[in-house]
């Protein structure tokens, strides 16, 4: 008889809807944060990907900068600066790069925040579930395990959901942050190239 009961336990797999119901309102909040983080990642990936392509195209036409990309705007910021004004040239380049950084890093902090909040909400769900379990024990005793199942399910499911959401979001944040930093580094490299070419022209002149 016990084998049949064990087989029934293994054969029953809760659906996603049932898992969400077991997690309660906290589980729903965790899943909502995960969906928000995923949407942010897709948005930032699409934006940074398009910026990367425009910057790469601009790098092939370095003598014809346009305002459609960060690199072009940085190069245009030093138009009209004389070759002899090296300090002013460097200041304008630094200012232009700093002006581009917020747009490239926008949303990264929010993705990281969502990744940090999710396991904490899972812990909150765990504590809440255990409180419900102890309340059931104090009211009805331990005679019927089904009365405690709801609280225990919430305690376990919210912990799992918090980790399931947090771990991918950490990878997403690392990917988006690395992509943004690589483009900022490319801007710095191009600025160094402008200063080097200016120094060569001064030396040649």
Where does each model-flagged region fall?
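Hydrophobic alpha-helical transmembrane segments
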Residues: 17-57
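Hydrophobic alpha-helical transmembrane segments of multipass membrane transporters and ion channels
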Residues: 25-31, 106, 110-123, 157-165
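Alpha-helical transmembrane segments
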Residues: 32, 36-42, 124-127, 131, ...
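Predominantly long cytosolic amphipathic alpha-helical stalk/bundle segments
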Residues: 49-124, 128-143, 171-205
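Helix-start (N-cap) segments at beta->loop->alpha junctions
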Residues: 12-16
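Extended, hydrophilic extramembrane loops/domains of integral membrane proteins
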Residues: 1-11, 84
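Residue-level signature of catalytic and energy-coupling elements of molecular machines
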Residues: 24, 38, 75, 122, ...
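Pore-lining and gate-forming transmembrane alpha-helices of multi-pass membrane transport proteins
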Residues: 146-177
């Amino acid at each position: 008889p016990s084998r049949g009961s064990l087989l029934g336990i293994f054969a029953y797999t809760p659906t996603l809807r049932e898992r969400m119901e077991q997690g309660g309102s906290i589980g729903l909040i965790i899943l909502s944060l995960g969906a928000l983080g995923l949407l942010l990642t897709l948005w930032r990936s699409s934006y940074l990907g398009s910026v990367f392509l425009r910057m790469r195209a601009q790098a092939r036409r370095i003598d014809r900068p346009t305002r459609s990309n960060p690199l072009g705007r940085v190069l245009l910021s030093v138009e009209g600066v004389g070759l002899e004004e090296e300090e002013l040239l460097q200041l304008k380049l630094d200012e232009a790069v700093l002006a581009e950084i917020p747009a490239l890093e926008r949303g990264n902090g929010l993705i990281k925040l969502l990744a940090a909040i999710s396991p904490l909400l899972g812990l909150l769900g765990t504590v809440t579930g255990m409180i419900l379990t102890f309340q059931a024990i104090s009211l009805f005793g331990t005679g019927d395990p089904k009365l405690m199942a709801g609280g225990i399910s919430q305690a376990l499911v919210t912990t799992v959901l918090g980790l399931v959401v947090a771990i991918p979001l950490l990878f997403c944040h690392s990917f988006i942050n690395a992509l943004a930093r690589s483009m900022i580094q490319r801007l710095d490299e191009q600025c160094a190239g402008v200063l080097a070419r200016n120094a060569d022209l001064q030396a040649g002149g």
